[in-house]
From Swiss-Prot:
Residues found modified as Phosphoserine: 193, 197, 202, 207, 617, 735, 800, 818
Organism encoding this protein: Rattus norvegicus (Rat)
Gene: Elac2
Region (Disordered): 15-46, 181-220, 794-827
The protein, known as: Zinc phosphodiesterase ELAC protein 2
Targeting presequence: 1-16
EC numbers: 3.1.26.11
Catalysed reactions listed for this entry: Endonucleolytic cleavage of RNA, removing extra 3' nucleotides from tRNA precursor, generating 3' termini of tRNAs. A 3'-hydroxy group is left at the tRNA terminus and a 5'-phosphoryl group is left at the trailer molecule
Compartments (UniProt record): Mitochondrion; Mitochondrion matrix, Mitochondrion nucleoid; Nucleus
Subunit details: Homodimer. Interacts with PTCD1.
Family statement drawn from the similarity comment of this UniProt entry: Belongs to the RNase Z family.
Assigned GO CC terms: mitochondrial nucleoid; mitochondrion; nucleus
Amino acid sequence: MWALRSLLRPLGLRTMSQGSARRPRPPKDPLRHLRTREKRGPGWGPGGPNTVYLQVVAAGGRDAAAALYVFSEYNRYLFNCGEGVQRLMQEHKLKVARLDNIFLTRMHWSNVGGLCGMILTLKETGLPKCVLSGPPQLEKYLEAIKIFSGPLKGIDLAVRPHSAPEYKDETMTVYQVPIHSERRCGEQEPSRSPKRSPNRLSPKQSSSDPGSAENGQCLPEGSSAGVNGKAWGRDPSLVVAFVCKLHLRKGNFLVLKAKELGLPVGTAAIAPIIAAVKDGKSITYEGREIAAEELCTPPDPGLVFIVVECPDEGFIQPICENDTFQRYQGEADAPVAVVVHIAPESVLIDSRYQQWMERFGPDTQHLILNENCPSVHNLRSHKIQTQLSLIHPDIFPQLTSFHSKEEGSTFSLPTVRGECLLKYHVRPKREWQRDTTLDCNTDEFIAEALELPNFQESVEEYRKNMQASPAPAEKRSQYPEIVFLGTGSAIPMKIRNVSSTLVNLSPDKSVLLDCGEGTFGQLCRHYGQQIDRVLCNLTAVFVSHLHADHHTGLLNILLQREHALASLGKPFQPLLVVAPTQLRAWLQQYHNQCQEILHHISMIPAKCLQKGAEVPSPPVERLISLLLETCDLQEFQTCLVRHCKHAFGCALVHSSGWKVVYSGDTMPCEALVQMGKDATLLIHEATLEDGLEEEAVEKTHSTTSQAIGVGMRMNAEFIMLNHFSQRYAKIPLFSPDFNEKVGIAFDHMKVCFGDFPTVPKLIPPLKALFADDIEEMVERREKRELRLVRAALLTQQADSSEDREPHQKRAHSEEPHSPQSKKVRAQ
C-alpha cells in the first residue's frame, strides 16, 4: 500500500497541491424519477396511485421532533423537518432525492431546524426544484439561511404560502388550513418568556455591540421585535394544517371475465372498452349491454388524511370551530382515513380536543406524535456504542434516552402513538404496519460483536496490557471531561453526527465547542434523564465558523436550555457565545422573522479574543471577564485558521494550569501551533486520509498525518483526531504517524486526561471490531493509487512520444527518399 504511493513521486504525479483552486464539479445527470416524469409529459393522467402510506420519521420525542414521510409511487412528501430528520432518512433509506414537496406546520425551530441541512443535501443530489408550503415566514427563513449557505444555486426553492389555493399533483390534492391561536403574539407562557438579563443580546442593544453595525443587521433605534413580533413577520400565533385528499383510483379491468364474455382481449379493439368501463360507463358489444361493474373492480375512493399541529391550549378552540375540518367530520363525502396529531399531552387531555377527535367517527385512525412517544430512532448509533462499550465501558458508555414524566392520555378512539418507521397504509388496504419499526436489542448487538474474528482475543489482550502497565505517578482529576458529540464532517450520517464537543470543566460548568445540527439530540442520547442538568451547567458555546455543520444546532440548545432552567427552577441567564461576528446576522434575521431568540445570547466576537486584539467596547470587555470568571479560565484565546473566511480555532487555559486547544476546521496552521504551544490536549480535525493531500487543500482541511504533525510541532501532550469525512463512517484509516500520543474520536466517546495512556491502546480492538470496514477502505485506497499510477505512466508515455516525434521528423526529412519509401507512401 505504502509502496504504491512511493511509485507516484518518481513518476512526477503530485500527491500534494501547493494551493490549487477547487476543481469545478461536472454537471449531474437528471434524477431517474425526473426523467420518467418528463417522458410521461404534462398530459399524462395516472388515475390515482396504487400505493400510499404514511411513515413516522421522528415520533416527536424530545430528541427527535415530529416528522412524517408520505410515500406514493409517483411522489414523496415530508411534513416538518426538525433537526436530525436528514440523518434519520439517510439511516433508514428514505430517499431524500425524491422529496419535491416539504410541508411545514409552523415556524418554530422544532419544525424547521433540519431544513437548512436538508436543502443543501437536496441541492447536492441534483433535485432541480423543491416546493415548501406553510407559514408566510418561510420565504424570509430561506433568505436568512443564505447568510451562511451562500446563494443556493442549482435548486429552485419555491414557497407556496398558506393562503394559496390547493396544490395538486399525480398523487393528491393538498389544502392548507391556517389556524390562529386565541393567544395573540406576546401572550406566551411565563416559563417561555423569562425576565431579560442586562447582558443579553437584544435588538436595541445590538446597535452598540461590535460588529453589528458593520454587518448592517441591527434593528433601528426605537423599534421593538419583542411583544409586537408581527411587525417584523414573526407570528407564533399561526399554525398551518394540511388536508390531503388522494385522487380516485379507478378499478382494475377483469381480463378473465372479459374473455368469458367474448370481448376482443389482446386486440386493439379492447382499449376503448377498458377506458369506458374504468370510467364507470356501460358498453354495448355485439348487441349486448355490459355494465361496468361486470368488467371492473370498484374504484378506490379518494380517501383523506389530515396533519394538524396544536402546540398549546390556545389553538384548541380555533381548531374545533374550523369550517374546513367540519366538512370532513360526520357524514363526509370523502372519508378521513387517519388524522396525525402533533400535540402535547396538555392538549390531548383537554375534553374539547377529545370531542373534536371523536367527531371524525369510529373508522378514522388517529396517530399521536409528541414527547410521550418513547422510540429509538438512531439504531446504528446505539448498536455501535453498545459494541464499543465491550472494549471500555467508561470511555464508551452505553446510550440512553429521555422519557417524559407526563402521564399519557387515554382515548376511546382507535389511537396509536408514533414510533420511528411505523407505517399506516392508506392504499391499497387501510392498515398499520409495524414490521419496519426498530428493535434496539443490545444482546443481539453484543453477540454480533463477539462473533467477529479476533475481537474477543484483542479485547483480552488489551486488558492484560493495561493491567501490566505501571500505575501513573499521580492520579489525574476527572475534569476536564471531554465528551465527543459529533465527530463527522459536512452532513449528519447514521454513525457520526456533525461537529460538536462538550468540555465539562467541573461538575457544574461546561463549554460546547461547535454546535452542529442534532447536537441536542446527541446530548439527550448521552445523558438521558440528566439532560436538563447538563443544559443548566452549560456556560458558553464556541462557534468556530459559519458552515452549517458547525452551528445549526445552536438554536435548539438555546431553546432547550431555557426549558431546562425553568423546569429545574433556576434563574434565566443568557448563554455566552463566542463566534465570528457574522453569526449575528443569521441570529438577527431568524429573530426578526421567525422566533424570538436574541434574549438567549450574550455574544463575544471571536476576533476580540485573538492575541493582542483590542476590545472595542466596555460591554464586550465585561462579557470577556464574565466568561473567564464563570469558566474559571485564565485565558480563552482564539486565532484565525486556514479554512473559510472568518474561521477560528481556540485555546482554553484553566486556572489549574491545563490547556485544551480546538482547531475547528483548518489546513495545517502555524497560528494554531503558536497559540497551542505545550497544550495538554489538542483536538484537531483529520477530515481525510493520507494520500489525499491535494483534495485536502481543495477543501481546506487536514489529513491524518498533517493533524498529528501540528500536534507534534505544538508539543501537545495528547492529540485527539476528529471531524472525519463521512467516507470513513465507522473508523478512519490509520497512518504510520500514529503513536502513543494520538487517539481517534467517536461520537459519545468520553475521555479525561487520565485516559491518555489508555486511548492509543484501544486501537487493536478497534481494528478487530471494524476489520471489514478497514479492509474495504484499504482496497479503495489501493485502487485509487493504481489509477493514479496508470494515469502517471500514460502521461509520461505521452510526453516522451511528443519529445521523440520532432526528432524523428527532423531525421526523416534529412534522409534521401529511396524508390521503396516512395512505394510505401503510395500504398
